[in-house]
Structure formats: C-alpha cells, structure tokens
Amino acid sequence: ANKQLQSINKLLKKTKENLSAEAEMTIKAKSSDKNLLLSATTMLSTNEYILVINDISSLRKLENLRKNLLSDISHEIKTPVSVIRAGSETLNSGALEDKETAKKFTQSIQDNAERLSEMIEDLLELEKIEFSGLVPNKKKMNVLQQINIIIDSLQSLMFEKNIQLNNSISSEHVIKTDKDSFRTILSNLIANAIKYSPDGSTISLKSSISETDITIEIADEGYGIEKQNLNRVFDRFYRTDKARAHTKGTGLGLSLVKQLTNRLGGNVSVESKINKGSKFFVRLPQK
C-alpha cells in the first residue's frame, strides 16, 4: 500500500509541474494482478487535483497475447520456410541429377508448404478466439448427429491406417452449444487420435451426462504421453519428442481445442500411459 501511495504522490507532484500527467500501477489482487492507468489534472482555479483511475488489465492482457502470438509465429514459421527455401534453391541449381533424390526434395517442400498453410489457418482461428470477444452462438443440437458428420469427414484418414472406430455416443444426448465450435473441438480430437494411433488399432468414443454437463471421451491405442508432458499437451506449438519424430503436425490443434472448450464454458483434460494409449475428456455445459 505504501508503494502505491508513493506512486500517487509522485504522479501528483509531476502533475503540479506539468498540469497533467499519467502513470501505470500494478496492484496485487487475490484472483489476478490489476493494471491501473492513473490520469491526474491540476485545477488551477482551486489548486486541486482531479485523479481518474482506469482498469486497463484486459488491454494489457491482449497486448501480451499479441506479443506471445508474434513471438510464436516468428519462431515456429522459420523451420518450414527454411526447408522450402533450401529445397527450392537446390532444385533450381540443377545439382540433383538423381530423380529419386529430387523427388524427395520436392516432397519435403510440399510437406512443409502444407504444414505452413495449416499453421497459418490454426493461428488465425486461435487469434479469432482470443481477440474477437465474440459470444458463442448456442443452439440445441443432437450430439450423435454432429459427431457422425465429423466421423464421415475423417473416413479417408481412418481408411489409410485401417483404423476401426467404436462409437458409443448416445442418440438421446441433446445439448445447447455453438455447433461450429463443437465440430472443431471433436474433429481435432478425433483426428489427433487417428494421427497417433498405430495401423489397425481402434478408437473409442463414449459419452456420459449429468444434470448440468455432458462429457465426451475419445480413447486411442497409441504410444501414449509421458507423465511429465501431460500438463503441456494443450500449450501452443507443443509437441512431444515422439510426436515430432513420427507424425506431421503444427502443435496447434490441442491448443485450439482448449481455447474453444473454455469459450463454451467447459474444459478438456487428458489421461495417458505409455504403450496404453490416451483418453481425452471434453466436458461441456448442457445449456
């Protein structure tokens, strides 16, 4: 408190010298720190001060989010861009006479171009969620009907890996939520399960409902996630060493899932054991 009073006195002294002045102050609160903007003006006629205090915590939070986003983009985009540039220069130089080697370079360029495209799409979606402040458009929908639409859109991915899907979602579950966000959440989680599942394995979908919430479980038979990495899988751009070595991806899908789930008033969690697969749980309010 003394520190804050000193800051205010310093501001008023500066105001006396310049007629007006501004200063920022951070106050420790129980839930989170508060960023305040103090604006002071001298009233010459009465020799008094007018002090206006504005809470700019949300503004500072948005600024920090944008800084982090730009930092993430500049860091993560370097790798695919470097591969595309180096591969293109090598091909254009005519140094590769072997067709098979040239084909590998071309495939690498294509893969990294696709990764770059996916990354930009996911980043734009994340930015829209974090900065738009849009209110979810909640309407009644049948959960099974929406999940069946998602499964149909992922059939080609499952066919490539000969993956079976056991869908035990009840046809009676009806909730009020944002349909587009719901589809994005479940599509990302099911696609993620397909990506990290071995060929010929099974993915299971289950649901349970309470008086207020619905919980959807997506279980795979993949390698699993190390215990020390469980609390990081929803971080932006985070991918485990195992994932980086064996699968393509941007590291943004689960971060997008978390942002959308939180936006709908729910949460997402994961349980996993090495060599026993992973289970993701999405809890959403019924209304």
Give the ranges of each region predicted by the language model.
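Conserved catalytic submotifs in the C-terminal HATPase_c
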Residues: 137-140, 159, 164-173
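Short helix N-cap motif at coil->helix boundaries in the Bergerat
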Residues: 143, 224-235
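Short alpha-helical segment of the dimerization/phosphotransfer core of two-component systems
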Residues: 111-116
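PAS-family sensory/regulatory modules and their coupling/dimerization elements
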Residues: 1-58
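Conserved micro-motifs of the catalytic ATP-binding
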Residues: 131-136, 174-178
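Conserved glycine-rich
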Residues: 265-266
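Short helix-loop "hinge" at the ATP-lid/N-box region of the Bergerat-fold HATPase_c
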Residues: 193-194
